[in-house]
């Protein structure tokens, strides 16, 4: 039997499918979000799987965005200088034309989760906005997926997730500013850093040839151990406490910092490998019994 159709000749699930939107384009400087690798030719299906997973996690962590929207915006404005606030308000005014609903004249709220088609094989990207902190958001998801009590396989096409806290243009001077912004709280802030860490830098480049991989690594290592720092962090490629992830795509560089359990416990945030490992352990346990 064929699928049920309504009076207009459309199938019953057409409205649900319309809710899923993928924008096309490049990643702007300052973008926060989550890269996801997936099976070849299944980029859209992977994005749909992630949309369900991400929206559930968003509701769990943050609830209805309307409740905290004004508060987060006020906090953001407090952190800005007067000059920056004026610039921000001008940018918001300029963006009202594209953000207005023509039928009602009301400005649409920006979605905290927005998928972007990068036109790159086996990769999709989800742009995030406040209150989402990408690295914390992804870690919470990985904890759920790694839970041995949770044996439901939520995804089929998704492979690896990589959060980026912020991003910048593919220029060395911009990379330096980005690195100082991202790594500072993890390596230089005495209120957060309690010891000398072993760390490593992992660089992934896709359609990117602007800056050499080793130049990126050497620069980031130099900034971690900057002159005048009260800490003496050391490079350890295998047994690191912290890993600095650098994602380079076309003209954009994204960066974040994750803990050592990224590799030891969460399979480098590879969802597929995490599932396989969990199911294998469950099978071995059943055989022994």
Curated annotation (Swiss-Prot):
Residues 1-31, 64-83 are annotated as: Disordered. CDD domains: THUMP_THUMPD1_like (cd11717). InterPro entries: THUMP_dom, THUMPD1-like. Keywords: Acyltransferase, Cytoplasm, Nucleus, Phosphoprotein, RNA-binding, Transferase, tRNA processing. Its EC number is 2.3.-.-. It comes from the Eukaryota. Its main location: cytoplasm. GO terms for biological process: tRNA modification. One of its GO terms (cellular component) is nucleus. The modification Phosphoserine is found at residue 72. Present with 2630 molecules/cell in log phase SD medium. This is tRNA acetyltransferase TAN1.
């Amino acid at each position: 039997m064929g699928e049920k159709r309504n009076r207009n000749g459309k199938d019953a699930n057409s409205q649900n499918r319309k809710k899923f939107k993928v924008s096309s384009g490049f990643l702007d400087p300052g973008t926060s979000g989550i890269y996801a690798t997936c099976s070849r030719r299944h980029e859209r299906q992977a994005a749909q799987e992630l949309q369900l997973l991400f929206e559930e996690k968003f509701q769990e962590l943050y609830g209805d965005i309307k409740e905290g929207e004004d508060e987060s915006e006020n906090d953001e404005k407090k952190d800005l200088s007067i000059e920056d606030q004026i610039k921000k308000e001008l940018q918001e005014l300029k963006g009202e034309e594209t953000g207005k609903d023509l039928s009602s004249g009301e400005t649409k709220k920006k979605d905290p989760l927005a998928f972007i088609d990068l036109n790159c094989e086996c990769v999709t990207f989800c742009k995030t906005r406040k209150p989402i902190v990408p690295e914390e958001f992804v870690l919470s998801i990985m904890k759920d997926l790694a839970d041995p009590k949770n044996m439901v396989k939520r995804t089929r096409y998704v492979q690896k997730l990589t959060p980026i806290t912020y991003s910048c243009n593919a220029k060395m001077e911009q990379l330096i500013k980005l690195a100082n912004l991202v790594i500072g709280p993890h390596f230089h802030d005495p209120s957060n850093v309690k010891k000398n860490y072993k760390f490593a830098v992992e660089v992934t480049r896709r359609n990117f040839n602007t800056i050499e991989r080793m130049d990126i690594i050497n620069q980031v290592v130099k900034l971690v151990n900057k002159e005048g720092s009260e800490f003496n962090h050391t490079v350890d490629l295998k047994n690191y406490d912290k890993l600095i992830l650098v994602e380079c795509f076309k003209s954009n560089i994204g960066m974040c910092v994750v803990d050592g359990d990224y590799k030891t416990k969460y399979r480098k945030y590879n969802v597929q490998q995490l599932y396989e490992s969990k199911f294998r352990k469950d099978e071995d346990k059943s055989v022994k019994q």
